[in-house]
Amino acid sequence: MTNREEIERRRTFAIISHPDAGKTTLTEKFLLYGGAIAQAGEVKGKRERAAKSDWMEIEKQRGISVTSSVMQFQHGGYCINILDTPGHQDFSEDTYRTLMAADSAVMVIDGAKGVEPQTRKLFKVCALRNIPIFTFINKMDRETRDPLELCEEVERELGIDTYPVNWPIGCGKEFAGVYDRDKRCILHFTDAGHAKKAGITEIELDDPALVDLIGQARRDTLADEVELLGAGRDFDLDAVRHGKLSPVFFGSALTNFGVEPFLNAFLEMTTPPLPRVSDAGEVDVYSPEFSAFVFKIQANMNKAHRDRLAFMRICSGKFERDTEYFHVQSGRKMRLSQPQTMMAAEREIVDEAYAGDIIGVFDPGIFSIGDTITMPGKKFRFSGIPTFEPEHFMLVSPKDTMKRKQFVKGVEQIAQEGAIQIFKIPDSGFEDVVVGVVGTLQFDVFEYRMKNEYGVDLRMSGLPYEHLRLIRECPCDVKDLMLCSGSRVLEDFKGRKLIAFGGEWSVGFLTKHNEGLILDDWLSV
């Protein structure tokens, strides 16, 4: 294949949802239908067989995704890159960064609950980029709300038009299949077990045999609903690809009903890799010159090797192993000799990759979130990835002072990942650090990782801070600043000084009583 043909067949998308809507289960079933796994993890439960996309030990224990997973597989002539994101709101920053690497999104909605708070937040991030958003209304094997009501809620709550591509036949125990509006036929499902592919029988709406399958009453109700749908808006693929119209599909990820038709239709409708914006203008994905940006850093994916991977989204051209590339932020040339594609924690060395692909490269400590990698001689930078301002803070120290070395290593590595903000206290060495997070569950993950990955038990105590400001200009030594109660000077791992405040009043006090002090808000950080 030519480079262009390889890029054209790439499909890179994220899966978003509110917690417990079935996002990870749907991801599993995509892998099942794509042939990437022979049996879905859902069937035996978390204890016997953890979900393929949940690789961190704490994820398997708690049954939630707390870090983004990357999975690549082939299906139907497409090369698919799935970005499975944390659904829990406490990990929204990792999700936000992952969405920056996606070309489209699958939004999973619980059919019994409809649009939920985290769904709204994640949808807004996707909408800002105008990427295609596909809706999968899940859990049709349980009692759900009225399908038409659910579509109307998506339109009302999220401000996007919808088009039901298929329509459910019943719900709960009565869920028997879907009507495919494009093929104008019923896809009747037969249960093959949750871990295996569902059987599908295609039958026309006016086929007398349909009554034997679903009964006369349901057949008549379906005919009325199909007629009602026909009076609605027409399908517009261009509107879909510009994020203005969301195709809606119904199914059950748990029973596999409706998953395969959704996957096949989604791959046909969604876009190949989209162009990216840099400080030198839009970068053409079909350019022969390689470029990429770092959207995630993860330490200790393999505890035996104590390694750290930088995840890169390729934005243009073709990546080739052992070729010399340029790291724009450091101004250094480098050879990436062991690039890897991922299936959660499992890896495979690759010799080449194309625009749209996600690769992981070993990071000796030079990469940061948002960094740009190009061909030598090219110095443009892709638009940066902002971080969320921490809302909760704790003072952290090792219980065993003899483990200070392990404590420092763990703190430094986790800080470089960027999902949890860690600050030093000036002139105090590493006796204590201040940890800032968006959601309090991240404290649990930090504590767990420090113990599990670095062997350090922590002493943690809450702090009253609510805001952070970066010191841009200071008229004196920071130690001589007049601080009010509940404020403290901190230092990040780039050596920049910040001030933590207990409230907005404290910010005003500081600038009023320290003439010449100029502070920047968190977005500047």
Q: Where would I find each of the regions flagged by the language model?
A:
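Structural and coupling elements of P-loop NTPases
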Residues: 1-525
